[in-house]
Amino acid sequence: ILQNCLVLRSFYRREKGGLIKKIKFNILSRIHKELLISVPFSKKGRLVGFCKDINLGYCSCHTVAFAAIQIAYSLKYARIICSGLDLTGSCSRFYDEDKNPMPSELTRDLFKILPFFRFMRENIEDINIYNLSDDTAIQYDIIPYMKISEIEEPCVYEKIS
């Protein structure tokens, strides 16, 4: 896993990349069907992706939430419920220390982050994901809103294969 995660680390470093990087990711996504990557051929286009198998690594997009979603999907959770997925930068981080809070870069990086979530919604048909945040930068057609009271409601799942 360490070797493969290093391969995907270059995915995070710079989403644009050169021709060789784009060819490399195109080949990787053809070899590994669980690694979904959109490789743009324009210079302005950004790489976006989603890895269905965490053993291959994960596609990073400037937020730990996207990595967590890929891990949950890879572990075949039938339903993924995100709490605190607002991406607005208006709240402090849950791990901040009162005297030394880390500045949030979400506002600056949002244009890089949202295409990954959109790509996930358009390409991962069997993902059953919800957002508990009623104030979020992620549109509800990408990750639907769920009230906390709805969590305990019974639901029928089909087995993810």
Regions from the language model: what does each represent?
Residues 1-161:
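Metal-ion/cofactor- or nucleotide/acyl-coenzyme-handling active-site neighborhoods
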